[in-house]
């Protein structure tokens, strides 16, 4: 029997001042999670503690009337909601509400294949929900609780105790998995295998380049976060044998809960010998620069500041030939100020294979410790 797609209407609540590409990204994230955006509301934050003005909240409640009673419907606030603001919105609209962190975690759940990825996602979700549950307990004592994260489930107090216990258990299990990963890395290093971590903004073509380099056919697509669990492959090229690792993509303003929960995944970059940073150069210059800046800042946040870094300027098949040199200089200028260990910018196309041989040659030269480059 064929599956029937569930109708998941949503209202997207966006802060004013986002760049056009960030607005597009918000729509893409909502759609990737399976939501159909039926309306949008723009707002300006009232204060640090209050997201929506009373007038904006009334406007949102009016827009949401058609969604009331639909268990699949969501109000998606493209910001990080504080507990009091979360319940304020739910009470006014009567519609289940998620914020940006919850949305990203829903997408992660769709692509999580490994036990570790599922645990990391659950840990991030529980940590994010914990303050909401504390606020729910406070409101329940005041008899002002409008409903919390959908119908059914545990009584609030019992659920809070369960969450605390579950977080502790997941952290223990992830520590054990992290220990095993470290043992595996040590074995590969003992065998003399350098590690190349492929990183970059979501949907830049990291997995496509990983496939082009390794000859594998891992799933790729235009949607965000197709890679949640790192993929590893040892290959030989230019007289060397190395391990390439495809990692989870970066995104603007990565929530701290996600960085912390995915520490062992992001650690692949921190322990690599070379960072291969993939950039989509088919986008406008300002978008390229902003995404590169965000990604490099994320690397710094996880302690990657002195690893040799090569930028793969990807998707040159979508760029006029005469623009490639200019884009290369743009990336060199933007990256070198933030990341002094930048080694090179190599134009490539993961789709056609153009430039991949030169990229591998440059990596081999770097690993061999050769000064300069003959590539």
From Swiss-Prot:
GO cellular component: cytoplasm
PROSITE patterns: G_HFLX (PS51705)
Cofactor: Mg(2+)
InterPro entries for the chain: G_HFLX_dom (IPR030394), GTP-bd (IPR006073), GTP-bd_M (IPR032305), GTPase_HflX (IPR016496), GTPase_HflX_N (IPR025121), GTPase_HflX_N_sf (IPR042108), P-loop_NTPase (IPR027417)
Domain Hflx-type G: 194-371
GO MF annotation: an example: ribosome binding
Main location: cytoplasm
Keywords: Cytoplasm, GTP-binding, Magnesium, Metal-binding, Nucleotide-binding
Record NCBIfam families: GTP_HflX
Similarity annotation: Belongs to the TRAFAC class OBG-HflX-like GTPase superfamily. HflX GTPase family.
UniProt name for this protein: GTPase HflX
Organism: Hyperthermus butylicus (strain DSM 5456 / JCM 9403 / PLM1-5)
């Amino acid at each position: 029997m064929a599956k029937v797609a569930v109708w998941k209407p949503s209202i997207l609540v966006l802060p004013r001042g986002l760049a056009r590409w960030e607005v597009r990204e918000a729509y893409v994230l909502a759609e990737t999670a399976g939501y159909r955006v039926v309306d949008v509301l723009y707002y300006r934050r009232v204060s640090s503690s209050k997201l929506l003005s009373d007038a904006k909240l009334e406007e949102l409640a009016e827009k949401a009337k058609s969604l009331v009673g639909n268990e699949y419907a969501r109000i998606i606030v493209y910001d990080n909601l504080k507990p009091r603001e979360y319940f304020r919105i739910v009470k006014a609209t009567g519609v289940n509400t998620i914020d940006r962190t919850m949305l990203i975690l829903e997408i992660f759940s769709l692509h999580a294949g490994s036990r570790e990825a599922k645990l990391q996602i659950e840990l991030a979700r529980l940590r994010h929900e914990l303050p909401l549950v504390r606020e729910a307990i406070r409101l329940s004592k005041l008899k002002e609780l409008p409903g919390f994260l959908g119908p059914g489930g545990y009584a609030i107090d019992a659920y809070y105790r369960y969450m605390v216990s579950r977080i502790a258990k997941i952290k223990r299990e992830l520590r054990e998995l992290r220990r095993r990963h470290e043992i595996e890395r040590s074995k590969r290093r003992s065998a003399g295998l350098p590690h190349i971590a492929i990183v970059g903004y979501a949907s830049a073509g990291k997995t496509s380049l990983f496939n082009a380099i390794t000859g594998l056919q891992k799933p790729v697509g235009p949607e965000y976060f197709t890679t949640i669990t790192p993929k590893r492959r040892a290959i030989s090229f230019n007289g060397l044998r190395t391990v390439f690792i495809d990692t989870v993509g970066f995104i603007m303003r990565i929530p701290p809960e996600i960085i912390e929960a995915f520490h062992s995944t992001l650690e692949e970059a921190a322990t690599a010998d070379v960072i291969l940073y993939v950039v989509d150069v088919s986008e406008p210059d300002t978008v390229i620069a902003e995404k590169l800046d965000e990604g490099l800042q994320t690397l710094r946040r996880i302690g990657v500041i002195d690893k040799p870094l090569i930028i793969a300027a990807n998707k040159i098949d979508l760029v006029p030939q005469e623009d490639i040199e200019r884009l290369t200089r743009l990336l060199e200028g933007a990256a070198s100020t933030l990341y002094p260990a930048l080694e090179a910018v190599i134009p490539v196309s993961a789709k056609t294979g153009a430039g991949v041989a030169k990229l591998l040659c440059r990596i081999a030269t770097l690993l061999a410790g050769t000064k300069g480059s003959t590539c």
